[in-house]
Amino acid sequence: MTTQADDSSIKPARPYAGKSAQERQNARRLALVDAAVRLFGEQGFSAVSIDMICAEAALTKRYFYEAFASREALLTAAYESVTREYFQAILVKMTPHMADAPKLVRAGLKETFGFVRRNPVKARLMMVEAMNVRGQLGDMYGARYDDFVELLLQVTRPLLGRQAPSDKVFRVMAKAVVGALIHLCQNWIATDFAQPVDELVEGTERLFAGVGRELGVRGYN
């Protein structure tokens, strides 16, 4: 004779050190991402093995494969983490100046170069190493580049004058400005931040001002 299982015998996983199993799993994943950001940013993706990542995170391979299917999947997560942090940082600085183009541009540029200088390892991953591993990043690299371009378009559109170009031409101009900014950051990192940040901000500010006048952006007329 079979009997129905007593539901009271089915117990959830017990918390360990005050954390649930899901919380511990999330913490391990975050530790692996943080380790990957450090190692990929310092040594480059091709030089870093899964064993090195696990040692840096103080975790075993079992926990690596619990969180990620491959080293490339971890690379994508690390890149996404860094770009998200950068976007949030510049938005915080730019938001108070959305109606004033020169102040908006200056705030965004100061925080861009400031983020790079404060976080050289993260910046190397985001600005330099990402260029070398675009194939491994798949669609993520292009998506984040487009996000940066879209952010520039969104904050600029409300400030445009009547002589604004078509959206397609406007997007090309935005891509050109973003590309120039990334190239400046790459060169600054490669020269170990030799050029004073004030010179970088002023020079890039003038570039944005020229584009702003061409677009008829209020504040640059």
Mark where each language-model region is.
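Hydrophobic alpha-helical connector segments
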Residues: A77, V92-V121, V201
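Solvent-exposed, amphipathic alpha-helical segments
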Residues: A31, A35-Q43, E85, A89-K93, ...
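Amphipathic alpha-helical packing segments from all-alpha helical-bundle domains
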Residues: R84, Q88, G135-G161, R171-H183, ...
